[in-house]
A protein has these predicted regions:
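Beta/alpha (TIM)-barrel catalytic core signal, keyed to glycine-rich beta->alpha loops juxtaposed to Asp/Glu
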Residues: 13-185
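Active-site groove signature of glycoside hydrolases
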Residues: 1-19
Length: 185
């Protein structure tokens, strides 16, 4: 009632918590059955959690895993992203522009990011977002406080970086070659 709607398009379990996944899935499926939600997903679940989720009845009804993902935080590329792709479950990347502060500044000032932005006629922020969106399975939810930024984010749908540009970004910010802890903000 407070939301002034009869249903939600998607309801996310934000943290794993102490409730067994089977009970969580049952509750989500009951909300779908009652028409309160159209779909459900999870947030901040790593590969082992997703495997466990998909092993419970209806766990494979999960529509998305929302995780931290940006050029400076690529740990999900090692095993979570391939697992989700194999199971046709999209990645919803939160903080795809690296939040704010010193990390974001260091990414934006990186010489490769700057060079690609200049050559492509886009902003360094758009380079960061284009990198995250290079795979079809990734949905990005960048924070935008100004109309100008919303429009710049929207324009990234038409940005196509070259293999050489992606390679330069990969060399500047390599994905891990081993399992890492899931980054969380």
């Amino acid at each position: 009632r407070n939301l002034r709607t009869d249903y939600l398009d998607m309801y996310l379990l934000h943290w794993r918590g102490s409730i067994p996944l089977e009970e969580t899935v049952e509750a989500m499926e009951e909300l779908v059955k009652k028409g309160k939600i159209r779909s459900w997903g999870v947030s901040n679940l790593d590969t082992s959690d997703m495997k466990e989720l998909f092993s419970v009845p209806n766990g494979d009804h999960c529509q998305v895993d929302q995780v931290l993902y940006h050029l400076g935080s690529r740990g999900i590329e090692y095993d979570l992203m391939p697992w989700l792709e194999e199971h046709q479950t999209p990645v919803m990347a939160y903080c795809p522009l690296a939040q704010a502060g010193s990390l974001q500044r260091s990414l934006l000032k990186n010489k490769e990011v700057q060079k690609i932005a200049k050559v492509s006629g886009i902003t360094p922020m758009q380079v960061l977002l284009a990198f995250v969106l290079r795979k079809d399975q990734v949905i990005a939810i960048p924070r935008s406080g100004r109309t100008e930024h919303v429009l710049q984010n929207w324009a990234v749908k038409d940005v196509i970086l070259t293999d050489e540009e992606y390679g330069a970004l990969d060399r500047a910010f390599p994905a891990p070659d081993h399992k890492t802890y899931l980054d969380i903000v």
